[in-house]
Amino acid sequence: MKFLEKDLEDIICKSFTNDYYNGLLVKKGLDLLDRHLWWHKRQLRIYGCGIADLVISHRNPYHKDNIHVNVIELKRGCINGESVLQCNKYIDGISKYLDTRGINHTISGTLIGDRLNISSTFLNRDDLFYMSFYTYSYDIDGIEFIKHEM
């Protein structure tokens, strides 16, 4: 059986609307949500930047005038420097959109792939400070995620 990027997207999206599935993903090593999910979009077209795989937003109940956006980019293969640049392009596009509308926000990126290979030229970039990196493996026991610190 071939595991596709869309399959990974389907698995993750189930967790956005179902606490049981979210709990399973957390046990498997992937923790993307807090209790205050506001909205999520699949295949979000970002004007002038491309299409982000998943975008989720959290709203803090104590600071309703501020939202946090997480751009989630899925890779069937390796996460590399191009993946980081692609995710940063989406982050910049969304941030500009929210800025022009006067919406207070913070924004981060999450990259998920089956391998991680980021050259040292990217490790010194400020952009990595707001990024999370996960690798996954898929076998007879299901899917497992490992978070990598940069």
Residue positions per predicted region:
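Charged, terminal alpha-helix-loop-beta segments
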Residues: 1-150
